[in-house]
Amino acid sequence: MLDSKFLRQDIEQTAARLAARGYELDVATVTALEEKRKTLQVKTQELQSQRNASAKAIGQAKAKGEDAQPLLDAVANLGSELDAAKAQQDVVLAAINDIALAIPNLPDESVPAGKDEDDNVEILTWGTPKKFDFDVKDHVDVGQDLNGLDFEMGVKISGARFTVMRGQVARMHRALTQYMLDTHTDKNGYTEMYVPYLVNSASLYGTSQLPKFAGDLFHTLGLVNDDGEQQSGFSLIPTAEVPLTNSARDEIYDESDLPIRLTAHTPCFRSEAGSYGRDTRGLIRQHQFDKVELVQLVKPEDSMATLEELTGHAEQILQELELPYRKVILCMGDMGFGSAKTYDLEVWLPAQNTYREISSCSNMADFQARRMQARFRREGAKKPELLHTLNGSGLAVGRTLVAILENYQQADGSVVVPEVLRPYMGGLEVIGKQ
């Protein structure tokens, strides 16, 4: 959520910055609501002041033995007026809040202009895509030929966009998770967390999935209590960013506690409501997939440097797996709702002859922290400040598996196990048909 000053002090400039990322702010409506808010605020303050003065006069009248009934009647009338004004004020504040919750973050000045992914800017490429001397198969064919990916069973058990893994392919999927967690905890200073996969709506509001992206989530129906009333349900997490970041909700940290680095491996659940017909083949876009998430909570002045660091931690995994990739900075029109600046890492997939996203690393600045009231107090200061929150995939496990199956495939259909994964797979060097 944006600082309210952006909607009060220079709304035209705010509207222009939002327009650059494709969001049209209704300036007239916001301005009208702000005028109502200010008018009602003055009115409630004046009525409160009058009621306080009348209450004091009642005490003085009673002390003198005078008839205080007229004053009592006046206080009652003032109380009714004050209640009505406060009710009006609450309605206006709720309307402003509803608008504020739908406004995306302001892009950082370093973010390039642009409308969509075609305008993203490549920062670097790493590694050289391998040249194969045989016809390259995609990960679906590689995995099925190894008897390690079973898409038909996934459909039978659950439906479209679900997959069953087995044998050494399933083991490699697990090995990737363990390797990623060990790297981030042992080398990069993250604390591993085990978090709930079901979260409440307050958590989803905190990290800005709600209210805008309710249709992208899977929601559970609440249980019916003994009185026959249905309780509030939970939602399945779309990413571990939600529970990890919400660990800071309503907290005030000491400056010395920062930075806080958290990581977790979780399944992620997404409806893919806006992806009909896209990536229907294989593991690229699933309703359920695993991811190792990275989250950092930092001081405001450190957040941009931290974005570089966090992105580097995700790049480290790709480099140690020797998977060619490129790093791009997202343009204003392609950034996520809550992001001030985002880097995407895209891994090379030879069967598609292109790079595909495998990690997205974002600096959310104080956008999430304001919703969550996640704060810290500087040494010697009385008033706490909002944290800056950052998150990124380190990495998406299924897509990493896809990249290995394609980049490490051999002419006989087997797949070489990357060296860094071999200790996690009992020393296995090659996966053959099972």
Swiss-Prot record:
Which residues are listed for ATP binding in this entry?
A: 270-272, 357-360
Which GO terms of the cellular component aspect does the record hold?
Answer: cytoplasm
What does the record give as its pathway?
Answer: Aminoacyl-tRNA biosynthesis; selenocysteinyl-tRNA(Sec) biosynthesis; L-seryl-tRNA(Sec) from L-serine and tRNA(Sec): step 1/1
Task: Spell out the subcellular localization from the entry.
Answer: Cytoplasm
The reaction(s) annotated as catalysed by this protein in its Swiss-Prot or TrEMBL entry are:
tRNA(Ser) + L-serine + ATP = L-seryl-tRNA(Ser) + AMP + diphosphate + H(+); tRNA(Sec) + L-serine + ATP = L-seryl-tRNA(Sec) + AMP + diphosphate + H(+)
Top EC class for this record: ligase
This protein's source sits in the domain of life called Bacteria
Q: Give residues annotated as binding L-serine.
A: 239-241, 293, 393
The family database entries (SUPFAM superfamilies) matched by this protein are listed as: Class II aaRS and biotin synthetases, tRNA-binding arm
Q: Which family does it belong to?
A: Belongs to the class-II aminoacyl-tRNA synthetase family. Type-1 seryl-tRNA synthetase subfamily.
Protein name, please?
Answer: Serine--tRNA ligase
